[in-house]
Amino acid sequence: MKILLSLVALLASVLFVQLGSGSLGPLDALSGKALNFSSIEIGLIGSAHFLGFMIGCYITPLLISRVGHSRTFASLASLGAISALAHMVLPDAFWWIILRILSGMSVAGTYTIIEIWIQPKLNNQNRGKITGVYRLVDISGTLMAQAMIALLEPATFIAYNIIAVMCCLSILPLSLTTSLPPNIPHKIRLRPIMVFQFSPLAAYGVLVAGLSNSIFRTMGALYASYSGLKISQVALFLVFGILGGALSQVPAGWIAAVSYTHLRAHET
């Protein structure tokens, strides 16, 4: 419990990051339709987010090693706010692709920093429980972000301003936390192949989940809209798509912790 209390600020930052980034994808799809973008253009805008996400995974460790965790987080969260605000200033599919690359970098970077901050507090006894709570907050933020779609009018300044505010709010809890950041490593190398070497099953599971989730989160709102659903119904469609995952996180974490304890008991 003490460890969870020490992570409240970080979890609050996670919540605000997800409130902003989780609503941007569906809003872009609906706004693209309102601005007469083609389905291909809307798909490319959604794909650009994940391209930016991959870029963010590579550049964030470099930024951390240069300026530290807090400054890197603030910079990347600000980048997310700027990219959201610029959408209606540049209402063109080409520029939206560029902006979604920037927002993807922002999301990847902010999550990387938060998870680096959390990792030193984990051990084999509490890892499953804390990870479950972390994912519950993360997916609950996604859930609320999908519900926000019912309140955000597509292709309007106010809708994108609200998303930018969420990005800015994510900076406050982490900036004010009393939890000390991890030590800054002198050299960081990102080697994705090591994930497959350590746990092939987990790596392939994440790959499959990423393929399915990215399609749903990018094009789900567009599909629902073209099916004749109202904006409020589109939001419900997206909410129920995320709800099952949100409800499963804490039980999965507890099962992982119990399974590890039993495994260790049998080994001894």
Give residue spans per PLM region:
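Paired small-residue
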Residues: F94-L102
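C-terminal ends and interior cores of transmembrane alpha-helices
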Residues: L79-P91
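C-terminal membrane-cytosol helix-exit motif in multi-pass small-molecule transporters
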Residues: A164-N183
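Conserved small/polar residues in nucleotide/adenosyl-binding loops
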Residues: T261-T268
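Helix-loop boundary and gating motifs at the non-cytosolic
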Residues: L5-F50, S214-Y223
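Helix-to-loop junctions at the C-terminal end of transmembrane segments
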Residues: C57-G68, Q249-Y260
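Cytoplasmic helix-loop-helix junction between adjacent transmembrane helices
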Residues: S103-L136
